[in-house]
Amino acid sequence: MALSASLHLRQSQSLVMTPQLMQSIQLLQMTHLELGQFIAQEVEKNPLLEFQSADEAGFGSDRPERDETGLTAEAGGAEESVDHGDLYDSATTSPGERLSTELDADFANVFQDDTAPQRADAPELLGQWKSMPGAGGSNDGEGYDLDDFVAGRKTLRETLIEQVAFAFAAPADRLIAQHLIDQLDEAGYLHAEIAETAARLGASAADVTRVLLVLQQFDPPGVFARTLSECLAIQLRLRNRLDPAMEALVANLELLARRDFASLKKICGVDEEDLIEMLAEIRKLDPKPGTSFETSVTEAIIPDVVVRSAPDGGWLVELNPDALPRVLVNHDYFAEISRHSQKNSAEQAFLSECMQNANWLTRSLDQRARTILKVASEIVRQQDAFLVHGVDHLRPLNLRIVADAIKMHESTVSRVTSNKYILTPRGLFELKYFFTVSIGSAENGDAHSAESVRHRIRTMISQESADAVLSDDDIVDILKRAGVDIARRTVAKYREAMNIPSSVQRRREKRALAKAAGF
């Protein structure tokens, strides 16, 4: 059979991932910090994009009325009210709109540079969050105390360097000391070998050891230790309490971790009363002496969504404007440049591309904001009992339930809830916190969330006494009487995940603590 070439026409549909669609997906899963960095890069590349400050956007805190163009959803019942006005659009007429006819350009879905989109009054919870120490979102400088900043706490390295100047006179010793200080971690532990340090500095191992012994007497006590046992031993030595029994105790911390008090009494050569006193003294020591110093600036978590009570008893879900980057398209500049550029020129093509990219970016940002609000509103509606009564009433929830309710794909819900935070009357939570697996009911009732069951287990164990320590089987019986159908191995798995020891270890520890409290 002869082979021949032919040309055929065929119509078909296929899904194509365009660069714009990929950008929208990436924007959806970005945190507000990543989004701010991305927009800063776009503003730098696109001459038609500009940042809009809070003052220009009309975000004054003294506005008495709620603006109807703000994104707000009411999640308290079946009715949900969301204003579908474009978040990145203006509601009033501007000179740019009059220019659109002249230039044959579409200026929809972009900010007008001479109008100010309004926002809803900041809810009480957002105001409380802003008043917290270290909270971000304010650029006006109010509440900033220069004296407090200048008199800030010293770092661990600065504290140790000051002591080196008084402890060592020889330049060689100071060089060794400064090198060892640079090898400390944030907890104050030394991660350097004596021989390696000596070879690197061209000093003898004896000199490095001598300097290290002096450094181990610095404040805070316990610094420059290489192990936890050495850290505790240094602190006990400075307190003049490192006797042979205590030295044996800190050398066998693994037995203490296993609550093997019988072996500890035998190794230390003490009776039960002496061991209890030694354990009480060990508890007063600091296992991480360096963590009490400032290491870096702690950034406050800025919530993406804020929830507050509605007057009708429901919940108002609002986007946090401090987490929304505000950008506008300078179409007046676009019109001015277009007048002076030739048609079909490279400049005109570049400007048209910039305008197209700017329009797409503003639409993507608007869609991102609305998607976050829609997902958060559905989560609040599903977890209404949690907001009212607490974690014991947290419902089991998964991505599919939320996706089906808002007519979106599960992957979209997953991207929205990734690294996004919501401020509620119960505190600040990651959106992922509300998604927990389901645990069946013992009486064919409503299922229970795994997080609420873990909370019950933690509460029961925290309230037990030394004479009534609950075993895993006891916890299973209590939960089944409360309507939770759970297996003993599941209780053990949850307990271990929360770093709670077994009932035998808890009983030993509680009895030892009870006896120590009597002294």
Swiss-Prot record:
Residues 396-415 bind DNA. The keyword Membrane does not apply. One of its GO terms (biological process) is DNA-templated transcription initiation. The keyword Signal does not apply. A motif (RPON box) lies at residues 487-495. GO terms for molecular function: DNA binding; DNA-binding transcription activator activity; nucleotidyltransferase activity; sigma factor activity. GO terms for cellular component: DNA-directed RNA polymerase complex. Residues 74-96 are annotated as: Disordered. Keywords: DNA-binding, DNA-directed RNA polymerase, Nucleotidyltransferase, Sigma factor, Transcription, Transcription regulation, Transferase. InterPro entries: RNA_pol_sigma_54 (IPR000394), RNA_pol_sigma_54_core-bd (IPR007046), RNA_pol_sigma_54_DNA-bd (IPR007634), RpoN_core-bd_sf (IPR038709). Sigma factors are initiation factors that promote the attachment of RNA polymerase to specific initiation sites and are then released. This sigma factor is responsible for the expression of the nitrogen fixation genes (nif operon), glnA and dctA for dicarboxylate transport. The open complex (sigma-54 and core RNA polymerase) serves as the receptor for receipt of the melting signal from the remotely bound activator proteins NifA, NtrC, or DctD for the expression of the regulated proteins. Belongs to the sigma-54 factor family. This is RNA polymerase sigma-54 factor. It comes from Sinorhizobium fredii (strain NBRC 101917 / NGR234). The gene is rpoN.
